[in-house]
Amino acid sequence: PGSAMLYRPRDVVSGDFYFAARAGEELLFAVADCTGHGVPGAFVSMIGLQQLREAAAHSSDPGEILSALNRSIRRALHQEGDDELRDGVSSVTHVKDGMDIILCSWNPATRTLRCAGANRPLWLLRDGALESIKGTNAAIAGFTPDEQIFETHTLVLQTPARLVLSSDGYADQFGGEKGKKFMVKRLQELLRSTATQTLEQQKRALASAFDDWKGEKEQVDDVCILVVEL
């Protein structure tokens, strides 16, 4: 499949990352948004990417991968047994650290798409409309318990479609005439209105709209948007 990526770290290093891998006949791809940005965000993102690769080597089911990822990152950050500390004081470093992520698997032979999200949706552009497939209402690691299940959604795409996987940094950017957030609705409308353009044109439109909105204001968060054409 064709793809385009808008990747704008707020600092030199980023808490957002993207991922792609083959799993047999299927292609896996993801966008993740780790706690924080800069060095702390990059630290969690480095661990997240490593653990995601390991989980994806054992399964191609997005929900199963996210459940395994939750357990392995909690172990890597020494968060096991910290659930009871939610309202107390924890001496464990990185107890709150975690990530939001949207993960997809695509089988081109059967045109079957599976996806699972941790606090992130998948947006599907087809036939002039944008559909939102909600993720599970839980993060990876942080205060999420080991036994958390992440739901896999399955669709068969009969017609061409574009998938949009995004962190929250674009929609959360302050700017415009009144210094307000860009907001998800405005981003969705921009994606919908540019869905018939080439991937490169759509990427340029996203970049231009972001820069125009931000103006002279500081970038508030890492930005990562992956568009995949199926």
What are these regions (language model features)?
Residues 1-164, 217-230:
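… and, occasionally, acidic/histidine-rich disordered N-termini of signaling adaptors
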Residues 66-67, 102, 153-165, 170-230:
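C-terminal catalytic subdomain
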